[in-house]
Amino acid sequence: MAYFHWAPDLDAAAYELEIYGEERTDLPEDAPGRGALHRTERLYTNSALIAMGDILQPGETYERLWWRVRPLNLDREPIGPFSALQSYMPARGDWQQTSPLPRAHFNGERGSSILYPVYSFTPMENAASYEVEVTRREPENPEGTAPSRYRVFSKVIANANLYDPSPRIGTYWWRVRAMDSEGRPLGGWSRAEPFRTDPADHWQVAVLGDSISHGGGRLSYGPADWAYSYAHYLDFPAVNLSESGDTSRMTVDRFEKDVVPFHPEYVLIMTGTNSLRAGVPASEVIADLKEIQQKARDQGITPILMTLPPINPAGIRRAFDQPTASDWQAAFQEVNAFIRREPSIDAAAPFRQWEEMPEDLAMDGLHGDWRAKEMMARVINEELPRLAPDLKTF
């Protein structure tokens, strides 16, 4: 496999990659070139693993390849020019790469300790599916193809992101392998990536909510793309206990299981968006928030509610083909009015000038893009110290 990697464009939903067998000086910046050995528009991360058989004809060999890439929007329309042509001299390891490459690296950057991991990797163009394996210890067979004896979870998926349905408290490893259309391995396992989310680390602050807090946006980016998580921009350490898909009731129901073991001093709570857009009455969401507050206080945890940013029903319909309750704005206003009367942070304040979330801040109408997450984090960084005077910052 040939491995290509480039700096991400955080406004892109996809990328177009062209590969040439010689250096070219006649390629237009704003249009595809002629004579490419390979071209694809179906790249959703800033990297690609492409089989040599998809690039070269039988018997062809090249000591050097040349490539370029440009960002695309959701409709696969360019939003920028092609990059400058770059040379690629395939190293032995690149040519022989037979497994996907992990992209999710936990516990390194700010906001990268999450209870519900998302296993993200660079896919292989010739693969039909992938098996992700999670183990309790480092796998004993890094060069093998069999499951590890330490396996605790695995799942076969067709895309390059697996949302773990279970909370992972403690230390684990994850890895992935590619399979063909018959379910046969195309190669071995990827390197095993360790990750740790442990109450023994004594987190002072926890983040609790749905996918808006879990992270991700612009359809192609998930929670392991840290630039799309507001926790990445916080000035203080925080463990992310959020789970994508949560309604306010679901957040209530998992409080004892997911929050209590960590026993943070403060829990930042943002939940209810999925409930309100589905037509759940504001009064029910408020009741759920009150129940979360009480559960926290009963455990000696200080609950801090956060207001809900607006959504964009047209964007949600376009991205997910889902309807939005017609009275969502009034419901959001009622819930946010309650939140503002409580110990809270007005995370929705940066968006008060808009009745709906602008497309350039949330392309899918629901999940804020990196700019929106940065704006939310700025408010949290400004407001939390008054509610948490003993806050430990970086």
Model feature map: region roles:
Residues 2-11, 115-126:
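Conserved aromatic anchor
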Residues 174, 251, 343, 360-394:
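Histidine-centered active-site loop/cap adjacent to the catalytic His
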Residues 18-62, 134-167:
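Recognizes extended acidic, P/S/T-rich segments that occur
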Residues 220-221, 231, 249-288, 309-313:
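Oxyanion-hole/transition-state-stabilizing segment in secreted/luminal serine hydrolases
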Residues 313-349:
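Substrate-gating cap/lid alpha-helix
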Residues 74-93, 181-197:
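Extracellular fibronectin type III
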Residues 184-244, 254-263:
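Serine-esterase "nucleophile elbow" of acetyl-processing enzymes
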